[in-house]
């Protein structure tokens, strides 16, 4: 090979990584801020991916994603959010709890944020209003606190003899403040409500052994993810009818759930992320709320608990798992 050809070839090869870096620099980056652990977010990531695809984005093709996981340690979220901002991501998606959304909001007033959690975003100061969020943040609300009276009603219908219902909350989650309204809802049904706090595995075990007639698990990343199997196994051991918001709960051999389709709502969050990356402003995108809710019951689990499900309850169920 002639010297001139060799120099030309060498110069071209040296330019390849420069061109690749330039292309990489022009690719938008999504910061993914999760309250739980990576292994527990597969369904959420899949749903977000579907929404992003609808909006024209595919991870590693025309979108890069920086993942940060708090592993259920809420105190880590502020530092993780600040780290994403320092990495100069183009947008942040927060999921798992309102704590992650609050951490993201505290970390930046300029980087757009899309949240998805079960808390009231107005009550917790995330947005100015549902229709006009304002600022740099919008997202998806599963409105779980507003569903508590209905969930208590369903637990009472499940077993009309129910006199006491324990409500499990995580005191490290700001949505623990929702508990104040639960007692009034129980009083209207003639049911005594007592709040059980738990933020560790040991406390979860103690909570299930409190001697209530039924257990309602308030939304929290710890309960929905790592604690789900533990709670359900303890509920089976103590023959305690238990309700969660998570729609996959009965399908895993557990008893009942009542709530929104979180997979579809997370898909909508992905669409919002894509729209913002294409130039729309979070302040102009109303907070999405579910319009339909589903009741699911597992009859095999009911039999194992010694429960005979009333016909009136089964008529309300959207899905009955034999």
Predicted regions and their residues:
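Short hydrophobic alpha-helices and adjacent helix-cap/hinge residues
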Residues: 1-322
């Amino acid at each position: 090979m002639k010297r001139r050809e060799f120099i030309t070839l060498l110069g071209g090869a040296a330019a390849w990584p420069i061109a690749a870096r330039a292309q990489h620099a022009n690719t938008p980056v999504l910061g993914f801020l999760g309250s739980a652990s990576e292994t527990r977010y597969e369904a959420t990531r899949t749903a977000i991916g579907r929404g992003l695809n609808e909006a024209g984005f595919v991870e590693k093709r025309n979108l890069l994603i920086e993942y940060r996981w708090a592993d259920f340690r809420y105190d880590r979220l502020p530092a993780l959010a600040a780290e994403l901002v320092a990495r100069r991501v183009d947008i942040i998606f927060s999921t798992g709890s309102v704590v992650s959304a609050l951490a993201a909001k505290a970390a930046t007033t300029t980087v757009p944020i899309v949240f998805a959690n079960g808390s009231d975003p107005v009550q917790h100061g995330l947005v100015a209003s549902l229709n006009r969020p304002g600022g740099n943040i919008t997202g998806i609300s599963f409105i779980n606190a507003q569903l508590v009276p209905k969930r208590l009603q369903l637990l009472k219908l499940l077993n009309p003899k129910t006199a006491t219902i324990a409500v499990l909350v995580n005191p490290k989650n700001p949505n623990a403040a929702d508990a104040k309204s639960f007692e009034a809802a129980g009083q209207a049904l003639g049911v005594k409500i007592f709040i059980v706090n738990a933020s560790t595995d040991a406390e979860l075990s103690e909570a299930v052994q409190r001697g209530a007639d039924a257990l309602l698990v308030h939304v929290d990343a710890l309960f929905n993810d790592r604690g789900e199997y533990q709670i359900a196994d303890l509920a089976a051991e103590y023959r305690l009818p238990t309700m969660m918001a998570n729609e996959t709960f009965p399908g895993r051999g557990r008893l009942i759930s009542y709530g929104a389709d979180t997979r579809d709502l997370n898909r909508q969050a992905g669409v919002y992320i894509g729209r913002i990356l294409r130039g729309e402003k979070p302040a102009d995108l109303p907070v999405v709320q579910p319009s339909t809710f589903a009741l699911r019951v597992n009859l095999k689990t009911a039999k194992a608990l010694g429960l005979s499900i009333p016909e009136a309850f089964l008529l309300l169920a959207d899905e009955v798992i034999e």
